[in-house]
Every structure is written in structure tokens, then in C-alpha cells.
């Protein structure tokens, strides 16, 4: 799709990001995942922190913000311990969190993952066991299921890992 731009989020984007997160919460609820993002998650402070740390990005189509995601490099504390499996490797990685779409265009997950894969050789992501739509999208982008991690609040998430070196080796 043409006319797609990905750039870091700014404070000026906050109102639009909140709208997009609201749309995403409603979509998750309607598609069998009503408990992943509850009570207004993510809160304004978390969104602002992501922006201020340079981890929040927006996907723009024809000058309109249509999606957002967090791409953070470095060790994610919730990924230090994985149950019922193992990460593909111990290489440095980036983590994708809080990906959300306005629903205005298709393919935003693909655009975000291509962006992440261009910047990092190893990318990790997790999702709720009820989020079948996201699980399918993650697997379609070449991620491998690795096991279960626990969020800071103790909730379980299914953990996935993309490694460029492993994906390239499996194609040969």
C-alpha cells in the first residue's frame, strides 16, 4: 500500500492515540478477547512515557494516523523468564507492545512488523491467549511461538520470537 509513513509519536498525537486505543479495545472485545486491555489500558501516563522514551510510533496513511505501536530495544523484564518453552536465542532484541489500529485500513500489523524487522534482527512480542486475531497475525509474519511469559501484574501471555538469522536459515 502506498502513502504509508511510520514516524515516532509526539505529544501532539496523544488525543488520536487514545481514540485508536479505544477502537482497539472495542475490537478485541467483539472478537472474543474482552479482558486483555481493560480499565482504559493503556493509561495516559503509560502512553506519554512511551512517547517521551522514543518508543512509540504511529503509522500514517494519506496524512492520517491509522495505527500506533511501541518498539523498544533492550531487555524486557517480563521476558526474562519464559515457561513451557524457550526463546529462539539469547541475541539482543526489540519488543513490540501496544499495537493498535483505527480499523481504517488493513495491513497495519504487517507494516509495523516490517518496520521492526528492518531495524532489528530479533523481535519479540506477546499476546493474550484469547486474542486469536493477533496470534494469527503474529504467526503470519514469521514469528515462532516460544512459550508463556507473565506480565508485571502476573497475567499470562503467549510469547513469540522472530529471528532474522533463523528465518533465513530455514528458507535455504
What name fits each language-model region?
Residues 126, 144-158:
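Conserved catalytic-core motifs of GNAT/GCN5-like acyltransferases
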Amino acid at each position: 500500500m502506498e502513502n504509508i509513513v511510520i514516524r515516532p509519536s509526539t505529544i501532539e498525537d496523544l488525543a488520536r492515540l487514545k481514540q485508536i486505543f479505544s477502537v482497539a479495545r472495542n475490537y478485541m472485545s467483539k472478537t472474543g478477547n474482552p479482558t486483555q486491555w481493560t480499565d482504559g489500558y493503556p493509561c495516559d501516563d503509560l502512553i506519554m512515557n512511551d512517547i517521551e522514551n522514543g518508543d512509540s510510533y504511529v503509522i500514517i496513511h494519506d496524512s492520517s494516523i491509522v495505527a500506533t505501536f511501541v518498539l523498544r530495544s533492550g531487555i524486557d523484564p517480563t521476558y526474562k523468564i519464559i515457561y513451557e518453552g524457550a526463546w529462539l536465542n539469547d541475541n539482543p532484541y526489540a519488543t513490540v507492545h501496544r499495537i493498535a489500529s483505527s480499523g481504517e485500513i488493513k495491513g497495519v500489523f504487517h507494516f509495523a512488523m516490517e518496520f521492526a524487522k528492518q531495524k532489528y534482527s530479533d523481535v519479540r512480542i506477546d499476546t493474550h491467549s484469547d486474542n486469536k486475531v493477533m496470534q494469527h497475525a503474529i504467526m503470519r509474519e514469521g514469528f515462532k511461538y516460544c512459550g508463556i511469559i507473565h506480565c508485571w501484574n502476573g497475567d499470562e501471555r503467549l510469547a513469540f520470537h522472530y529471528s532474522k538469522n533463523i528465518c533465513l536459515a530455514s528458507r535455504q
